[in-house]
């Protein structure tokens, strides 16, 4: 214990020597043992070399009084080593940023009890500087006090600690619990505040009727969110027809690529639903159909069997080759269309069927022959009539991209391709709309060609083929030739039209044989009647 007491007294004396009293002669020299930490220039430097004016400064007296340290006589500091100076050097490097922005003239604040009674609390950096040692410690205390006062001034809006006491007593009582809680939490967890002006926006809610979205003019108040997005609403709800000027007046600079694709798909959908303009001097054929509306049926663009064809004033004759009940639900059964149907007063004979709804639709269309039937017949990848199972048997074990062209088993389509991709045999129908062939007639962004052979040539290039599209790089050649009758039909169809076949001096059976490879293009759809059927 005696040894510990001597060490403590020695340590206390060293700390007190840093704060010399006025008129005291402090001629403490650094011992030679401190050469391990100090440079050669710092060996002969004496801490007591400062002038009496510097020692008698009121700032130094104030520091000594606040720290509770009494002036002491000169005593040499011996047996110093590097270990005792490490905390001082680290402390200087940490608080260097705060010392750069400190200005003198600010009243010092008391240090807390922990740092005041700690053994290292009063130790100064006597070995790290020479002339600026005392000013460094004073500036450090100035920075701590000034930064604390600035934080209080920013928070309470006062300029001194004395004003802060009066302001705090006046404002704490008037501040609400939420404000005091927010001040306590601070900026770490900011609480969201809602202005009173935003409350009426949520209170004025009302239901929007579907009929309001179908109006030509905006029914919503100007400046509202719906009024600003009215052009987007009309883009998806307004019927687009060749006579519609909505998209013609729309600013194309405001439309992005995705919006442009959506706009094209919408126009294609309505074009499939309404039909296209017929070519001049084209013979118009008419379908009249009456069927039951079933909303579960998927509406498609093709004309299925089960419809009644009339020419001129002849009566309607139902077709007998109706495969199933679903074939009678054709494109004319598009009950989801929301625009008003044009009611015609003309009387048409039709076959009525019982059901929940009775729909009478008149569809005008034209017949067109396949334009490149001769090239298709001469193509070695074309196998003629073949179902999917025969095609899969031929493609089994073939490399990626092997394909063949065959007749489609569905009556609504002419041709299909069977190909190998992803180690399996896949099939894709060739669709047609507005005299263009593609693998998806509903999407105008998909590649399309005016001929079937042109479509096949495009997908032979792997760089032009998407991962979900057919890859047709290697053709699987057929092993048999077509008959002379097939080749003659292809040659005749290249030189005439569908309606021109009727003028050829041929028997009706041969005329039907020549018309086999043709497609129907819809040119106009008219909804004549739509009314509920009374249950018996």
UniProtKB/Swiss-Prot annotation:
Any one GO biological process: negative regulation of signal transduction
PROSITE patterns for this protein: SH2, SOCS
Record region (Required for interaction with IL4R): 1-50
PTM summary: Phosphorylated. Phosphorylation is induced by EGF.
A GO cellular component entry from the record: cytosol
Domain SOCS box per the UniProt entry, residue ranges: 471-520
Biological role stated in the UniProt entry: SOCS family proteins form part of a classical negative feedback system that regulates cytokine signal transduction. May be a substrate-recognition component of a SCF-like ECS (Elongin BC-CUL2/5-SOCS-box protein) E3 ubiquitin-protein ligase complex which mediates the ubiquitination and subsequent proteasomal degradation of target proteins. Inhibits for instance EGF signaling by mediating the degradation of the EGF receptor/EGFR. Involved in the regulation of T-helper cell differentiation by inhibiting of the IL4 signaling pathway which promotes differentiation into the Th2 phenotype.
Protein name, UniProt field: Suppressor of cytokine signaling 5
Organism: Homo sapiens (Human)
Gene from which the chain derives: SOCS5
């Amino acid at each position: 214990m005696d040894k510990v007491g001597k060490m403590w007294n020695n340590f206390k004396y060293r700390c007190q020597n840093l704060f010399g009293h006025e008129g005291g002669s402090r001629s403490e020299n650094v011992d030679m043992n401190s050469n391990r930490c100090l440079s050669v220039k710092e060996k002969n430097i004496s801490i007591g070399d400062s002038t009496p004016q510097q020692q008698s400064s009121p700032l130094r007296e104030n520091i000594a009084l606040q720290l509770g340290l009494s002036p002491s006589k000169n005593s040499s500091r011996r047996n110093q080593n590097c270990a005792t100076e490490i905390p001082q050097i680290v402390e200087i490097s940490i608080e260097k940023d705060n010392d750069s922005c400190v200005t003198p003239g600010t009243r010092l604040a008391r240090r807390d009890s922990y740092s005041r009674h700690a053994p290292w609390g009063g130790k100064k950096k006597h070995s790290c500087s020479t002339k600026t040692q005392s000013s460094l410690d004073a500036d450090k205390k100035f920075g701590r006090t000034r930064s604390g006062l600035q934080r209080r001034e920013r928070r309470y809006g006062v300029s001194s600690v004395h004003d802060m006491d009066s302001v705090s007593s006046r404002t704490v009582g008037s501040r609400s619990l939420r404000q005091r809680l927010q001040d306590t939490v601070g900026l770490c967890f900011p609480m969201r505040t809602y202005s009173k002006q935003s409350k009426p926006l949520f209170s004025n809610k009302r239901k929007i009727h579907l009929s309001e979205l179908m109006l030509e003019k905006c029914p919503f108040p100007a400046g509202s969110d719906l009024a600003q997005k009215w052009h987007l609403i009309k883009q998806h709800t307004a019927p687009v027809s060749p006579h519609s000027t909505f998209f013609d007046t729309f600013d194309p600079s405001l439309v992005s690529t995705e919006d442009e694709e959506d706009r094209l798909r919408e126009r294609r959908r309505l074009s499939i639903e309404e039909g296209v303009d017929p070519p001049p001097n084209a013979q118009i054929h008419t379908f009249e159909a009456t069927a039951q509306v079933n909303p579960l049926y998927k509406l498609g663009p093709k004309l299925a069997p089960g419809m009644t064809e009339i020419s001129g004033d002849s009566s309607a004759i139902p077709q007998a080759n109706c495969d199933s009940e679903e074939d009678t639900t054709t494109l004319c059964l598009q009950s989801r269309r929301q625009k008003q149907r044009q009611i015609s007063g003309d009387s048409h004979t039709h076959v009525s069927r019982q059901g929940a709804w009775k729909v009478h639709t008149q569809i005008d269309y034209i017949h067109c022959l396949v334009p490149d039937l001769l090239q298709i017949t001469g193509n070695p990848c074309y196998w003629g009539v073949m179902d999917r199972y025969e095609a899969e048997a031929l493609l089994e074990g073939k490399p990626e991209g092997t394909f063949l062209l065959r007749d489609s088993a569905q009556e609504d389509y002419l041709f299909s391709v069977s190909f190998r991709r992803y180690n399996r045999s896949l099939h894709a129908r060739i669709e047609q709309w507005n005299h263009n062939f593609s693998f998806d007639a509903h999407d105008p962004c998909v590649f399309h060609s005016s001929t079937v052979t042109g479509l096949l040539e495009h997908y032979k290039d792997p760089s032009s083929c998407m991962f979900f599209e057919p890859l047709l790089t290697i053709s699987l050649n057929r092993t048999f030739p077509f008959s002379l009758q097939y080749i003659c039909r292809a040659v005749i169809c290249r030189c005439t039209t569908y309606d021109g076949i009727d003028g050829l001096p041929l028997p009706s059976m041969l005329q039907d044989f020549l018309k086999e490879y043709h497609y129907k293009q819809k040119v106009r759809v008219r909804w004549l009647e739509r009314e509920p059927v009374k249950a018996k």
